[in-house]
Amino acid sequence: ADELGVKLEVQDMNFQALLTSLTGGKVDIAIAGINPTEERKKSMDFSADYLPTEQKVIIRKEDGSRYKKLEDLFGKTVGVQKSTTQEALAKEKIKDAKIVSLAHVPEVVLELKQGKVDGLVVEGIVGGQYLVFNDDLMFSEVEFPNSVKSSAAAVQKGNEDVVAVVNKVIKENTDNGNFKKWTDEYSRKAVENADKQ
């Protein structure tokens, strides 16, 4: 916001609403672990990538021996956050699975803890935060081929000037180590805040 010379206004919304708000002109920049897919590039522009992350599956610890490879999830019930790369990945790679798509990751975590889904497909960084304060859950050994995805900031289509400024800020903060520092710091804060609930 400082580099653009504008006042920062943060709006918290679910992922699907965020993308709709961006394409509808209600927000100028969306930063929420957004993967710049070819489909999304049709309706919005993206900055340079700033955060690579692997896609993982969270399961209940008691099921640790049941879900070791992707095929073990075929035909099972799998939870995802709605309108995400993880939703598309689960639909594409987990054959005959019943996909449960919910607006927020905590809702899917609750479904998993209650036994309503067998696994949760999530970004590794996000999933790691939930594992810290849910000691009954774990990452499975399931691996998705070519599952490392990168996040980028999304802007309204045709806003090349904003993309250029965002790219400058990304480069500066990658080069000086801030992204790594921020990821560590805010992951820790997320865990601390969750522990208070």
Question: What feature does the model see in each segment?
Answer:
Residues 28-29, 118-119, 152:
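Short, Asp-centered acidic motifs that coordinate Mg2+ and/or phosphate
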Residues 34-43, 89-92, 113-114, 118-147:
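A ligand-binding cleft/hinge motif common to bilobed small-molecule-binding domains
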Residues 2, 35, 56-107, 124-126, ...:
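Bilobed "Venus flytrap"/periplasmic-binding protein-like clamshell domains
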Residues 22-23, 73, 112-113, 153, ...:
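Hydrophobic residues within well-ordered alpha-helices
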Residues 52-59, 128-171, 189-197:
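Periplasmic-binding protein-like
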Residues 7-72, 135-139, 143-146:
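Acidic, polar ligand-binding/catalytic clefts
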Residues 85-100, 139-143, 170-197:
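Ligand-binding clefts/hinges and TM-proximal coupling segments of bilobed small-molecule sensing domains
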Residues 1-4, 61-62, 77, 82-84, ...:
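Extended ligand-binding regions for polar small-molecule ligands
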